[in-house]
Amino acid sequence: MAEDADMRNELEEMQRRADQLADESLESTRRMLQLVEESKDAGIRTLVMLDEQGEQLERIEEGMDQINKDMKEAEKNLTDLGKFCGLCVCPCNKLKSSDAYKKAWGNNQDGVVASQPARVVDEREQMAISGGFIRRVTNDARENEMDENLEQVSGIIGNLRHMALDMGNEIDTQNRQIDRIMEKADSNKTRIDEANQRATKMLGSG
């Protein structure tokens, strides 16, 4: 009888321990799910900010392109005016043959973004492991929830990986666009300075 009582006590203790571990494991999966959902929300906000920044860069580069077009017209007018005034100085052609001009405008992409962020894909079906994510012990609703939580965590982690790749691609694209904008801005400034000098010289000669 004493041995039976001891065995029952031991079994009850094992059951209590199993229940305790199941409760702790369930809470752990809930915390994991909350953390990855917060990370996903932060990732989405970051992608939205990058997209808005990309639109701003597009507008800036379009402005640089418009200045370039306007300067072509202004340089042509100055050249015609210079011929009329008997001046042969035409630094605009020399400027257009310079390395800086070719670098800024030679391969003008007109602000076209080379790559767009890929669509975030839910990978839960791909990541789900046949038979579930956990080894069953208590075989109750807690383990069902644990399995569901881990499946969601796995899917969100897959999404986060795609988000990270999208962010990296978008940042690389924007960095290249910023370099183009800087080159175009420098080229436009040089051309505006040259045009001002020519106009001043022609006015002075008049």
From Swiss-Prot:
Q: Which InterPro entries match?
A: SNAP-25_dom, SNAP-25_N_SNARE_chord, T_SNARE_dom
* Compositional bias annotation for Basic and acidic residues: 1-20
Could you give one GO CC term from the UniProt record?
Answer: growth cone
Q: What biological-process GO terms show up in the record?
A: associative learning; axonogenesis; calcium ion-regulated exocytosis of neurotransmitter; endosomal transport; exocytosis; locomotory behavior; long-term memory; long-term synaptic potentiation
From which residue to which does any coiled coil extend? none
Region described as Interaction with ZDHHC17: spans on this chain: 111-120
Impact reported for residue 116 to A:
Inhibits interaction with ZDHHC13 and ZDHHC17
| GO MF term set | calcium-dependent protein binding; lipid binding; myosin binding; protein domain specific binding; SNAP receptor activity; SNARE binding; syntaxin-1 binding; transmembrane transporter binding
**Record PTM text:** Palmitoylated. Cys-85 appears to be the main site, and palmitoylation is required for membrane association.
Q: Which residues carry this modification: Phosphoserine?
A: 154, 187
In-chain residues carrying the UniProt-annotated modification Phosphothreonine:
138
Q: What is its main location?
A: cytoplasm
The record's subcellular location field reads: Cytoplasm, Perinuclear region; Cell membrane; Synapse, Synaptosome; Photoreceptor inner segment
Consequence the record notes for mutating residue 117 to A: Inhibits interaction with ZDHHC13 and ZDHHC17
The region called Disordered is annotated at 1-23
Where are the stretches annotated Interaction with CENPF?
A: 1-75
Any single Pfam family the record assigns to this protein: SNAP-25
Where's the t-SNARE coiled-coil homology domain?
Answer: 19-81, 140-202
The UniProt keyword set, sorted, is: Cell membrane, Coiled coil, Cytoplasm, Lipoprotein, Membrane, Palmitate, Phosphoprotein, Repeat, Synapse, Synaptosome
Q: What does this protein do?
A: t-SNARE involved in the molecular regulation of neurotransmitter release. May play an important role in the synaptic function of specific neuronal systems. Associates with proteins involved in vesicle docking and membrane fusion. Regulates plasma membrane recycling through its interaction with CENPF. Modulates the gating characteristics of the delayed rectifier voltage-dependent potassium channel KCNB1 in pancreatic beta cells.
The record's similarity note reads: Belongs to the SNAP-25 family.
- How is the subunit organization of this protein annotated in UniProt? Part of the SNARE core complex containing SNAP25, VAMP2 and STX1A;this complex constitutes the basic catalytic machinery of the complex neurotransmitter release apparatus. Recruited to the SNARE complex following binding of the SNARE complex component STX1A to STXBP1. This complex binds CPLX1. Found in a complex containing SYT1, SV2B and syntaxin-1. Found in a ternary complex with STX1A and VAMP8. Interacts with HSC70 and with SYT9, forming a complex with DNAJC5. The interaction with SYT9 is inhibited in presence of calcium. Isoform 1 and isoform 2 interact with BLOC1S6. Interacts with CENPF.
Name of the protein in its database record: Synaptosomal-associated protein 25
Organism from which the protein derives: Rattus norvegicus
Give the gene name. Snap25
